[in-house]
């Protein structure tokens, strides 16, 4: 048999998609395929697509079209493949395969079949697969950080969200499986493990009959990794037991990523959020009291169908009052196949854009003040890269999660992938600036 083809992967979308990408790379490398970062040199390009909102789809389509124009053999994977497999095959003759979110672990078989001239469609209608610690994985993050998926899929049916259709219902891994993978990551030198799923606070509900996040955090606390960070914690799932586990487990960062989406009870009911109108001041204040120094990140959707000016003002006041450390704002995106798509009272895009801009303008001085509070402190920073032009090191303190939050720009010398003390001397609304604290 001749030499195996080389394969490049173009990764788009969220960190859940990134883990899928890393498993595909691991499986291909184990099977003896050459993996190249240069798409021009590769025989096949796997495009791991995102289909969460319209702008993500546009980026995916743009990438696919560019590769098609370069006459590449394209394997389309990820959420867009799950969502639009028929249209993609019809419109892109260069696509040799379409692989769904529950089928990426069969990527080696897909390439083998494509090599035989078959046009492969492998899309499970209801994804049920979840990789575990035995699935090969080739990490694409910086050496000090790794994402760790604790569960896949979602049992909630929020009116705006297509994720359950794209990723299936929730399926959790066992605590033992997650701990085993965490130990593998630590052996690779990982300093920060970021726990992800669709709803991390619901972890374990499907396999244990009740959420087991507190038990998971305590188990991971016994592992020799400096930082454990959680993403996607629903406020109603932050029970006294979970809060106690965060407090009692030294390597769990007091960083809470709360996808609140809105503050007004009527909008939350329209969104079919699981807590309906229970996102209120009491929940946020309880968290701040229970975990002093907690860093709170959240995301909001503005312009949900029927959102009135008064309801938007309620959101503005909520954000002003609680002074979150980090806020992401999305304008509502009408997704075909979701209940919100059919709602008659859709808002014009210009109204949504204006509301997004107003909310971001309100948050900016809050973020600036929060960062100014770090000036003068010596903080632990995970060094991730070096700017070759300026010589400055770039990293993150525990306040910042990768890609969504700010960074710390550092003068001095340090090894990439290590956590070092840095004295912060200045800050803007996004980033911190500091100097390595020498050990002499």
Curated annotation (Swiss-Prot):
Keywords on this record?
A: 4Fe-4S, Cytoplasm, Iron, Iron-sulfur, Metal-binding, S-adenosyl-L-methionine, Transferase
Q: Which domain of life is it from?
A: Bacteria
* Cellular component, GO annotation: cytosol
Q: Which residues form the TRAM domain?
A: 372-438
- Please give the SMART domains that the UniProt record associates with this protein: Elp3
Cofactor binding, note field:
Binds 2 [4Fe-4S] clusters. One cluster is coordinated with 3 cysteines and an exchangeable S-adenosyl-L-methionine.
Instruction: Give the cofactors, semicolon-separated.
Output: [4Fe-4S] cluster
Q: Which residues bind [4Fe-4S] cluster 1?
A: 14, 50, 79
Protein residues bound to [4Fe-4S] cluster 2: 154, 158, 161
Q: Where in the cell is it found?
A: Cytoplasm
EC annotation from Swiss-Prot or TrEMBL: 2.8.4.4
The primary location reported for this protein is cytoplasm
Q: Which GO terms describe its biological process?
A: tRNA modification
The UniProt catalytic activity note for this protein reads: L-aspartate(89)-[ribosomal protein uS12]-hydrogen + (sulfur carrier)-SH + AH2 + 2 S-adenosyl-L-methionine = 3-methylsulfanyl-L-aspartate(89)-[ribosomal protein uS12]-hydrogen + (sulfur carrier)-H + 5'-deoxyadenosine + L-methionine + A + S-adenosyl-L-homocysteine + 2 H(+)
MF-aspect GO terms:
4 iron, 4 sulfur cluster binding; aspartic acid methylthiotransferase activity; metal ion binding; protein methylthiotransferase activity
Q: Which SUPFAM superfamilies match?
A: Radical SAM enzymes (SSF102114)
Q: Which residues form the Radical SAM core domain?
A: 140-370
Q: Which residues form the MTTase N-terminal domain?
A: 5-116
Which InterPro entries does the record match to this protein? Elp3/MiaA/NifB-like_rSAM (IPR006638), Methylthiotransferase (IPR005839), Methylthiotransferase_CS (IPR020612), Methylthiotransferase_N (IPR013848), Methylthiotransferase_N_sf (IPR038135), NA-bd_OB-fold (IPR012340), Ribosomal_uS12_MeSTrfase_RimO (IPR005840), rSAM (IPR007197)
What family name appears in the similarity comment? Belongs to the methylthiotransferase family. RimO subfamily.
Job of this protein: Catalyzes the methylthiolation of an aspartic acid residue of ribosomal protein uS12.
Q: Can you name this protein?
A: Ribosomal protein uS12 methylthiotransferase RimO
Which species does this protein come from? Trichormus variabilis (strain ATCC 29413 / PCC 7937)
Supply the gene name. Answer: rimO
């Amino acid at each position: 048999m001749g030499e195996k083809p080389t394969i490049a992967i173009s990764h788009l979308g969220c960190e859940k998609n990134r883990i899928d990408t890393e498993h595909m790379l691991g499986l291909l490398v184990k099977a003896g395929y050459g993996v190249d970062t240069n798409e021009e040199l590769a025989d096949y390009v796997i495009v791991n697509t995102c289909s969460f909102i319209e702008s993500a789809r546009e980026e995916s389509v743009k990438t696919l079209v560019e590769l098609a124009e370069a006459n590449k053999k394209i394997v389309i994977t990820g959420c867009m493949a799950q969502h639009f497999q028929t249209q993609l095959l019809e419109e892109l003759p260069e696509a040799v395969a379409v692989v769904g979110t529950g089928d990426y672990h069969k990527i080696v078989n897909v390439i083998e079949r494509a090599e035989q001239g078959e046009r492969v469609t492998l899309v499970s209608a209801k994804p049920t697969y979840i990789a575990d610690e035995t699935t090969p994985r080739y990490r694409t993050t910086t050496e000090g950080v790794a994402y760790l998926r604790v569960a896949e899929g979602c049992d909630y049916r929020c009116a705006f969200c297509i994720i359950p259709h794209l990723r299936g219902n929730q399926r959790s891994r066992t605590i033992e499986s997650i701990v085993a993978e965490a130990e593998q990551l630590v052996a690779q030198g990982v300093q920060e493990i970021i726990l992800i799923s669709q709803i991390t606070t619901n972890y374990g509900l499907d396999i244990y009959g009740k959420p087991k996040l507190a038990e998971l955090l305590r188990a991971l606390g016994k592992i020799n990794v400096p930082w454990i960070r959680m993403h996607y914690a629903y406020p109603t799932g932050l029970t006294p037991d979970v809060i106690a586990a965060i407090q009692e487990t030294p390597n769990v960062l007091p960083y809470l990523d709360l996808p609140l989406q809105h503050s007004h009870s009527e909008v939350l009911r329209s969104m079919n959020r699981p807590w309906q109108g229970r996102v209120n001041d009491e929940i946020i204040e309880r968290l701040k009291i229970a975990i002093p120094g907690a860093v709170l990140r959240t995301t909001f959707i503005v312009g949900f169908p029927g959102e009135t000016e008064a309801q938007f003002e309620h959101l503005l006041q909520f954000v002003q009052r609680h002074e979150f450390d980090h806020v992401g704002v999305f304008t509502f995106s009408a997704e075909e196949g979701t209940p919100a798509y059919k709602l008659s009272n859709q808002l014009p895009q210009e109204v949504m854009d204006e509301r997004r801009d107003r909310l971001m303008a309100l948050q900016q001085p809050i973020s600036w003040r929060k960062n100014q509070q770090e000036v003068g402190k010596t903080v632990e920073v995970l060094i991730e890269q070096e700017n070759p032009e300026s010589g400055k090191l770039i990293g993150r303190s525990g306040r910042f999660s990768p890609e969504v939050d700010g960074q710390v720009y550092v003068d001095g010398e340090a090894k990439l992938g290590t956590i070092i003390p840095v004295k912060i001397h200045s800050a803007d609304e996004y980033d911190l600036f500091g100097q390595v604290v020498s050990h002499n």
